[in-house]
Amino acid sequence: MDKIFVDEAVNELQTIQDMLRWSVSRFSAANIWYGHGTDNPWDEAVQLVLPSLYLPLDIPEDMRTARLTSSEKHRIVERVIRRVNERIPVAYLTNKAWFCGHEFYVDERVLVPRSPIGELINNKFAGLISKQPQHILDMCTGSGCIAIACAYAFPDAEVDAVDISPDALAVAEQNIEEHGLIHNVIPIRSDLFRDLPKVQYDLIVTNPPYVDAEDMSDLPNEYRHEPELGLASGTDGLKLTRRILGNAADYLADDGVLICEVGNSMVHLMEQYPDVPFTWLEFDNGGDGVFMLTKEQLIAAREHFAIYKD
């Protein structure tokens, strides 16, 4: 962005509303990619401008006319420039993201939270589980957002938050502490189930890496700032999912269920395993590629995934 253009913004824009409008204009003109918690330039601007001012997203309407200091304007303009020129997701610029109505710390060690599984958590998995879960596993926890949201939804449950990445677990631990859930959510480093004791979970929720090789090569630049370890999963996007399917039954209680997100790779899963009775879940707020299997169904399908058992 031209320096004269930037100086003009700092000198002439005065209020929060001015900065919101200017940010929307810049985002719209730059044709940036939305997909890290927002789907339009207005929401993108709100999530950049207000956290940059250490304000909540739901400030009163009349507060938007508040005037800004020069340093505040410079901070916002700098972040807008980086969002446009470097295609950095807003969450990495502000170190804030939201999931299930809760705020989380994020940086480039973890993916930005955006899973449709959040809708299931908000609905307490209604119609999917037969009882209140006492022991929940969040596999591939990343920032810990799913594990923490589950702990809020089921305050009497113990939640294990598993990831192979020590960097991701450091972020998850920070979020667990900030939410005051150190006695409810337990971070565990493990290569999927490989280093876990044989615990029986009532519910296993997982959003593993599932982007196939073709989609990885075509991802917008915004996704290049996210850890590849959290995205890529082999040629067809199912490298980790097969291992999960090969092992999950051993870690589920008799009436337990597995809920797994595979995104666009659902096509490959259905093509390769037509005999497996995946229940594909529907969402009111958008999203797809999430299936459910019961322990009984996983046991019945074992022959398909036996070679992937740890």
Swiss-Prot record:
Q: Which GO terms describe its biological process?
A: protein methylation
- Please indicate if the UniProt record lists Transferase as a keyword: yes
* Assigned EC number: 2.1.1.298
Here the disulfide bonds are none
Spell out the molecular function terms from Gene Ontology.
Answer: nucleic acid binding; protein methyltransferase activity; protein-glutamine N-methyltransferase activity; S-adenosylmethionine-dependent methyltransferase activity
Give UniProt keywords alphabetically: Methyltransferase, S-adenosyl-L-methionine, Transferase
Q: Which residues form a coiled coil?
A: none
Example GO CC term: the record gives: cytosol
**Reactions catalysed according to its record:** L-glutaminyl-[ribosomal protein uL3] + S-adenosyl-L-methionine = N(5)-methyl-L-glutaminyl-[ribosomal protein uL3] + S-adenosyl-L-homocysteine + H(+)
Free-text function comment from the UniProt entry: Specifically methylates ribosomal protein uL3 on 'Gln-150'. Does not methylate the translation termination release factors RF1 or RF2.
Do you know which HAMAP family this protein is assigned to?
L3_methyltr_PrmB
Family the UniProt entry places it in: Belongs to the protein N5-glutamine methyltransferase family. PrmB subfamily.
Please state what the protein is called.
Ribosomal protein uL3 glutamine methyltransferase
Q: Which gene encodes it?
A: prmB
